[in-house]
Amino acid sequence: METKPARVRILDAAHELMLTVGLARATTKEIARAAGCSEAALYKYFDSKEELFVRVLTERLPRLTPLLDSLAAAPGRGTLEENLTEIARQAALFYEQSFPIAASLYAETQLKRRHDDTLRTMGSGPHLPLQGLDAYLRAEQAAGRVHPDADTYAAASLLMGACAQRAFAYDTTESGERPPVDAFATRLARTLLGGIAVADRP
């Protein structure tokens, strides 16, 4: 059987360890061991654990940012409801998979501060999807499909916030199950549209 390239093995191992033990406890040494390579080899491909974390988010999780970028670059394509439904679906899946990875950071204050500083230096962070959705809604506003008085940043915050909350808000319900992602995304998009869409427009 063909062996995967080292970079792929490292990303796979990092993804698995970050999901199972959390970002705070997934050391580069453990990741390298799980990938079957040395820690020095890991640093040939990734400058830091923070960079590895960002690459896991962008290459192993639902591709939320590319979706937002492509929609913002071509406003007027598809219907608003279709586009917002797909954004909500991808965002819900992204947060569902990323929340268990990042949650452990909040128990380690110094590690969290260092992590935030590194992401800031890299120009990355959890604010990017929010900014990306705001940019898309502003593009649609300029195209005449979002009401001119709509607060696009608030609308983006409502959608992304609901998608993020879905990752953990249902753990203590009787069933412990999240709402099915497709139905959740459809309802969320339709409700948001009721507040921002131009009347009688798609």
Residue locations for each model-derived region?
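Helix-turn-helix
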Residues: 9, 17-51, 55
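Helix-loop "lid/cap" segments that line or gate small-molecule binding pockets
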Residues: 73, 88-96, 103-111, 191-195
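C-terminal peripheral helix-coil segments that are non-catalytic and often amphipathic
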Residues: 82, 86, 93, 127-143, ...
